[in-house]
Amino acid sequence: MSGHSSYQPSTGIERWLDTRLPIVRMMYDQFVAFPVPKNINYAYAFGAILAVFLIIQIVSGVVLAMHYVAQDTLAFASIEHIMRDVNYGWLIRYIHMNGASFFFFAVYAHTFRGMYYGSYKEPREVLWILGVIIIILMMATAFMGYVLPWGQMSFWGATVITNLFSAIPYIGDPIVTWLWGGYSVGNPTLTRFYSLHYLLPFVIVGVVMLHVWALHVTGQTNPTGVEVKSEKDTVRFTPFALTKDAVALGVCFIAFAWFVFFVPNYLGHADNYIPANPGVTPAHIVPEWYLLPFYAILRAVPDKLGGVIAMFGALVVLLFLPWLDGSKVRSAAYRPLYRIFFWLFVADCIFLGWLGAMPAEGIYPTLSQVGTVWYFAHFLVIVPALGYFEKPKPLPESISAAVLEAHSRPSLLARLINR
């Protein structure tokens, strides 16, 4: 998608800098004049939303780190100090807490959009793999951040999740001891998690830069899945795509503000407002909502090692999706059978999320096993089979042809009026 630069320095300073460090030219080419397909919809705005929320999380996290004390006897009190004594500390903390939830909601929506429109297919395999790596890094960062308040759910969540490594034969127990910094979760564990929680967002920034670089090499996908064939198929990123992203961000910020100011603890857990007590186990240990589907997969397998393999396998299988899907058609808009199974997969992920919040008793483990089998069957059986047997609809000749065809059809309102 890259071509000859259209940037023209307008001042002497810009011309001087352009001959020595053409950073303004690079920003102009990548974020102003960059060509994007003219038919992208609001589903493509989640990338911009993710970029903004990554910045919000880093800035709010750095400010919180100035007042947080990574010591097991003071961590909980330091959080209360932030809430009560630091100017606008309550606001910064609630922004950081709910920002994490919105960050994950956006990344899941971004991933589902990529699966629906085939954004993982050739030549965008590396782009997709980098995206999956970002999700894995986000989960690690979020888990470590969940431990820092040192409440009941923080302490016992850290105990349960880190204990999973003990399932690894021969080396599992030494790994757990190394993670804990001793023989139980304590102050060394907290300081290690605090250090890594501060570091990993900047690692995510680095991978995001590679992700954006890969995107700008291969170009943006679009709802038809047809590649750009001429300049008629594209528009400039600024102002066209930027305006669409701004509208989506505005709607997102309205919802975000509602959570921050009116229901800031709705997505959290009440037990985390109780100081950590190694002698009292919570009745029901659960992670944050955005990790619940994988927690359900973990608990679906009775064997401890099998559960760990299944949980990590649920992420690893995403890395191989570009090669599991053999269909020549990218977009689900032209794949009727794939579209049905895609929405069943989305429903299964939501189902697993609900099961992850339920106690591991009664019928819930059995339902988790059903949901887990369907999750892996989607990638390992259904998607490869559809690539061979599905008969897709005819593709448009170009993006421009698809846009003209869509505009030639009467709108829903017009069809209702003409009845």
Curated annotation (Swiss-Prot):
Its membrane topology: Multi-pass membrane protein
Binding site for heme b b566: H110, H211
Cofactor dependency: heme b
CDD domains: cytochrome_b_C, Cytochrome_b_N
Highest taxon, organism lineage: Bacteria
Function text: Component of the ubiquinol-cytochrome c reductase complex (complex III or cytochrome b-c1 complex), which is a respiratory chain that generates an electrochemical potential coupled to ATP synthesis.
Complex formation: The main subunits of complex b-c1 are: cytochrome b, cytochrome c1 and the Rieske protein.
Official protein name in the record: Cytochrome b
Organism from which the protein derives: Blastochloris viridis (Rhodopseudomonas viridis)
Record lineage: Bacteria, Pseudomonadati, Pseudomonadota, Alphaproteobacteria, Hyphomicrobiales
